[in-house]
């Protein structure tokens, strides 16, 4: 997990998280007042979390499919990690703060294998191997 701190005119470019299955973002703080948008086409999008495309279904689709109101502090948005997303900049004083994380889904067999590997690693370190 990591925190993201954005201030006036800062943004998060379009990206996805290819190293996992599920991603999430929770809005922790949002500026009380956002100045009017610089350009007309940004109206209503300032500071917003935007999901684009269809994830693995269509990697070339870039039309926005959903806008999430980042001012809803405390909301947790879960989404497929392959889904392209970005955060638009905002104008005004204050901070947009969020908490993000990536997660993977594994089987019990995979988990048992990881635990066994870690045990062996620990034992080898104890023996100086």
Residue spans for each PLM region:
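Catalytic core of non-heme Fe(II) oxygenases with the double-stranded beta-helix
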Residues: 2-78, 88, 112
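Catalytic core of Fe(II)/2-oxoglutarate
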Residues: 57-129
